[in-house]
Amino acid sequence: TTRCYHKAAQKMCRLMTEDYGNPSSLHCKGVEAEQAIREAKKILAGSLKVQEKELYFTSGGTESDNLALIGCAFANQRAGKHLITTSIEHPAVLQAMKYLSEQGFRITYLPVDSYGVVRLADLEEALCPDTILVSVMYVNNEVGSLQPIAEIGRLLKNREKPILFHV
């Protein structure tokens, strides 16, 4: 959790007090809210170098993790039912993985070293033909450990079969 950027907070305050309409509504406030969302998507898409249609706004991190993990798992289950994460993930990820386990997916929880970092050798050993997704947080929210995300990405990219990578 980080402090909100001051300009972003000012913009959100204005949106919540002035442009508070339902963006799906046809009245003035709704149209203004929809325009604000389109403007935000355009700015974010440009910054992230993605298409606007690739961006989804959710209510927060837990909903985003659920959408990504559960959605990707079910959408790709024909390719495999094995998922990999770490033992120190955010509770939202761990709960999503628990749910997926109850739905018949096989979950591997990677251990971390004394600094809270995943060992690439452990990840490589855990990968199997049935693996469809790896989820590793970039910076741990409790201890601040940084995971080797670039190295994990390269490892997964070099696999014969594509594996989704959730960070």
What are these regions (language model features)?
Residues 1-167:
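Pyridoxal 5′-phosphate
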